[in-house]
């Protein structure tokens, strides 16, 4: 049997959506966590800790909540949009769950076990340099040596990585927004909802940007045709699986988002939620009763990069196409072009971590 999503983790996640006994019991620890986070952030802003300024604009895509909000598809969409705008973006990520001794380039032929599932997905979906290492500043500097033509950096999931100065911050949420609005461990927040940012991006198909909420934009994930894992040349619409016995499996931060999208396409799948970044070293389908009974097994692109060794014609991969409000794309493009210098110099380590262009900060709360 596969490793199930941890019962304790599911319990805590559910508690984070309300202000019940758990939230109040954890509140003293949240106050301490908030104090430490505030001191750390202000310490970088005031120059108490060293940070690195790159010779190019840095756009950060991250979240103030724990868990997946759709950052990877957002980075993919932004990389594609900036490339279409004539810019030359590069992407730096941490490489979650991978032990790295030095910065490593992610190629489309890389293995997820060597570079991480999300960076590999970005590398395969875009034609931009992608590098991984926990020290994002060093990683970016190393990338620039190999790719000196890069003139804008996308920092994947680096909102709290203040060692690298930034020029534009995007804070992402999904339909869960900020939960109960409390900091860890009483709630899901790493930082307060009121944290300043340049833009708020809501990954929710029902969200609509309106003039009374400036700085807030929407993103939706549209299902593309599914392709067969054993033979990627085989493709068909997801709706073609309607009426079949379908098992949907997902090892992502919010599996229910994937399951709901399949239901929206007319499917009634059995579901198998797996831990985020599940490594698929053990085959979760080999003795699972719903898998044994299924005609079709649907998985995400993020999981597919770790399932390539599986030889099961029932497994189909469901890609998603991220669509971001054009207003955010244009706002980022203007901010980036305003920062690009004609003759960049070598990156340098300087005191002070904010390094942010306050002209673009709107301070818009998320909720």
From Swiss-Prot:
GO terms for biological process: lipid A biosynthetic process; lipopolysaccharide core region biosynthetic process. Residues 343-367 are annotated as: Disordered. GO terms for cellular component: plasma membrane. Its EC number is 2.7.1.130. It comes from the Bacteria. Keywords: ATP-binding, Kinase, Lipid A biosynthesis, Lipid biosynthesis, Lipid metabolism, Nucleotide-binding, Transferase. Residues 343-355 have a biased composition (Low complexity). It catalyses: a lipid A disaccharide + ATP = a lipid IVA + ADP + H(+). ATP binds at residues 65-72. Belongs to the LpxK family. PANTHER family: TETRAACYLDISACCHARIDE 4'-KINASE (PTHR42724), TETRAACYLDISACCHARIDE 4'-KINASE, MITOCHONDRIAL-RELATED (PTHR42724:SF1). This is Tetraacyldisaccharide 4'-kinase.
